């Protein structure tokens, strides 16, 4: 039995293309892997705090006492990291907003990137500590960006996930959503076919 963590980040709720793909992924995964456990965390509906000058102090070990706000942030960071480490498959819904991931998803990454916890520095360089995971990224875009300089999502996620130890990453794209109903429908259809392949793998 595997445990699947699904991270939603779209601010568009029911109108979200990435949300629809995520729901389809969950539906297909449950159908093909009946015994698996799925956890859904909606980072838009329940956002995590922005890492600011005060909160960053909570993420770095020190002798100074933590403020109540820092204590809350550290507890949340611990919770998010424990949740991440407890799951085998990480599904990341990452719609493209202004060429990159949503703020809500970036805030999540900022809270789980902790030296000595999810990665560490060694004489040979940084080493990821979140290993043995598989990640699936579902990314919807209004335009066509895959394999072009305007796609900042795929390179960033490969680097970040690899940095914390997750190197098995599959991408599913739904592109050209804003190009009209026909293009959008084909994008969704192609993305669902790609999801079917990922789920069956």
Swiss-Prot record:
PANTHER family: FMN-DEPENDENT NADH-AZOREDUCTASE 1 (PTHR43741), FMN-DEPENDENT NADH:QUINONE OXIDOREDUCTASE (PTHR43741:SF2). InterPro entries: Flavodoxin_fold, Flavoprotein-like_sf, FMN-dep_NADH:Q_OxRdtase_AzoR1, NADH:quinone_OxRdtase_FMN_depd. Homodimer. Quinone reductase that provides resistance to thiol-specific stress caused by electrophilic quinones. Also exhibits azoreductase activity. Catalyzes the reductive cleavage of the azo bond in aromatic azo compounds to the corresponding amines. This is FMN-dependent NADH:quinone oxidoreductase. Keywords: Flavoprotein, FMN, NAD, Oxidoreductase. It comes from the Bacteria. FMN binds at residues 10, 16-18, 96-99, 140-143. The keyword NAD applies. The gene is azoR. Belongs to the azoreductase type 1 family. It catalyses: 2 a quinone + NADH + H(+) = 2 a 1,4-benzosemiquinone + NAD(+); N,N-dimethyl-1,4-phenylenediamine + anthranilate + 2 NAD(+) = 2-(4-dimethylaminophenyl)diazenylbenzoate + 2 NADH + 2 H(+). Its cofactor is FMN.
């Amino acid at each position: 039995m595997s445990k699947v963590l699904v991270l939603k980040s779209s601010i568009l709720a029911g109108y979200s293309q990435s949300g629809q793909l995520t729901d389809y992924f969950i539906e297909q995964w449950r159908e093909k892997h009946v015994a698996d456990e799925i956890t859904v965390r909606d980072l838009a509906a329940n956002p995590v705090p922005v890492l600011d000058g005060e909160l960053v102090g909570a993420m770095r070990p020190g002798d100074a006492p933590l403020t109540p706000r820092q204590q809350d942030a550290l507890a949340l960071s611990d919770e998010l990291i424990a949740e991440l480490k407890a799951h085998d498959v990480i599904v990341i819904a990452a719609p493209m907003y202004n060429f990159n991931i949503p703020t809500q998803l970036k805030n999540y990454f900022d809270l789980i990137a902790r030296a000595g916890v999810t990665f560490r520095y060694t004489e040979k360089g940084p080493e990821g500590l979140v290993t043995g995971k598989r990640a699936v990224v579902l990314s919807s875009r209004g335009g066509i960006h895959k394999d072009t300089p305007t796609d900042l999502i795929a390179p960033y996620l490969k680097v970040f996930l690899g940095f914390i130890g997750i190197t098995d990453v599959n991408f599913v794209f739904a592109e050209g959503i804003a190009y009209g109903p026909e293009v959008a429908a084909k994008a969704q259809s192609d993305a669902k076919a790609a999801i079917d392949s990922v789920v069956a793998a």
